[in-house]
A protein has these predicted regions:
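Phosphate/pyrophosphate-binding catalytic cores of soluble transferases and nucleic-acid-acting enzymes
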Residues: 1-146
Length: 146
């Protein structure tokens, strides 16, 4: 059975430093598990690891998404699982590092893996609810009686 290592803790607790030390000892690569560090262009506000922090160790799923494109915990967990397999296929140890409890739960226990809400549709449904909640409920029951 192939294994991976997970480091979870609060902000500024030394997770990144520890993950790099362990990656060097275990011949590993680091996968981010942070709900904000996924976004590009906000590295300072999210404490994304710098090149210096990474110290030559490959890091994955940091700063890869535009902030205008939300990501669900389920979608993120799917990406992490893919990275784990890729790293293990290369004979290395995946080290999952971060502090996002919901993302960790999605990874270990499962969660809806669909994309985030369709915001225009959500807006229309919210307006329909405000206009006539009973009519919306009846409409929903016609689609899904349960």
């Amino acid at each position: 059975m192939k294994k991976n290592l997970t480091i979870i803790g609060p902000t500024a607790s030394g997770k990144t430093f520890l993950s790099v030390v362990l990656a060097k000892k275990l011949v590993g690569e680091i996968i981010g598990l942070d709900s904000r560090q996924v976004y590009d262009g906000i590295s300072i506000g999210t404490a994304q690891p710098t090149k210096e922090d990474m110290d030559g160790i490959p890091h994955h799923l940091f700063g890869f998404r535009d902030p205008s494109e939300p990501i669900s915990a389920g979608e993120y967990a799917k990406l992490v699982r893919t990275k784990i397999k890729d790293i293990q296929a290369n004979g290395k140890t995946p080290i999952i590092c971060g502090g996002a409890g919901l993302y960790y739960r999605a990874l270990t226990k499962g969660i809806f893996e669909g994309s985030v809400s369709d915001l225009p549709t959500r807006g229309r449904l919210e307006q329909a609810y405000e206009d006539d909640p009973a009519a919306l409920l009846e409409r929903l029951r016609s689609v899904d009686p349960e």
